[in-house]
Amino acid sequence: MSVLTSLLLRGLTGSARRLPVPRAKVHSMPPEEELGTLEKAIALTSCFVSLFLPAGWILSHLEDYKRPE
């Protein structure tokens, strides 16, 4: 990297380093009800099925999607 490029990059990023970053004022409370083991298992299973079942079906039927040559 040339000296000119490094000076240009330093000039562009130098002003951004001096800007204050506002802190987010996010406060949350603990949950009213804890999730049970069964509810967590159902949620994890539904996420797994909704993500991996369509992908697995497409991959298993990949030959059907190929054009005959």
UniProtKB/Swiss-Prot annotation:
Membrane-crossing segments per the record: 37-60
Topology relative to the membrane: Single-pass membrane protein
One GO term of the biological process aspect: mitochondrial electron transport, cytochrome c to oxygen
Subunit comment: Component of the cytochrome c oxidase (complex IV, CIV), a multisubunit enzyme composed of 14 subunits. The complex is composed of a catalytic core of 3 subunits MT-CO1, MT-CO2 and MT-CO3, encoded in the mitochondrial DNA, and 11 supernumerary subunits COX4I, COX5A, COX5B, COX6A, COX6B, COX6C, COX7A, COX7B, COX7C, COX8 and NDUFA4, which are encoded in the nuclear genome.
InterPro entries in the record: Cyt_c_oxidase_su8 (IPR003205), Cyt_c_oxidase_su8_sf (IPR036548)
Modified how: In response to mitochondrial stress, the precursor protein is ubiquitinated by the SIFI complex in the cytoplasm before mitochondrial import, leading to its degradation. Within the SIFI complex, UBR4 initiates ubiquitin chain that are further elongated or branched by KCMF1.
Gene name tied to this protein: COX8A
Subcellular location: Mitochondrion inner membrane
Pathway entry: Energy metabolism; oxidative phosphorylation
Keyword Iron among UniProt keywords: no
Keywords of this entry: Membrane, Mitochondrion, Mitochondrion inner membrane, Transit peptide, Transmembrane, Transmembrane helix, Ubl conjugation
Described function: Component of the cytochrome c oxidase, the last enzyme in the mitochondrial electron transport chain which drives oxidative phosphorylation. The respiratory chain contains 3 multisubunit complexes succinate dehydrogenase (complex II, CII), ubiquinol-cytochrome c oxidoreductase (cytochrome b-c1 complex, complex III, CIII) and cytochrome c oxidase (complex IV, CIV), that cooperate to transfer electrons derived from NADH and succinate to molecular oxygen, creating an electrochemical gradient over the inner membrane that drives transmembrane transport and the ATP synthase.
UniProt motif (SIFI-degron) ranges: 2-19
Domain of life: Eukaryota
Record: transit peptide: 1-25
The family this protein is said to belong to: Belongs to the cytochrome c oxidase VIII family.
Mitochondrial matrix side: 26-36
GO cellular component: mitochondrial inner membrane; respiratory chain complex IV
UniProt-recorded name of the protein: Cytochrome c oxidase subunit 8A, mitochondrial
Topological domain spans for side Mitochondrial intermembrane: 61-69
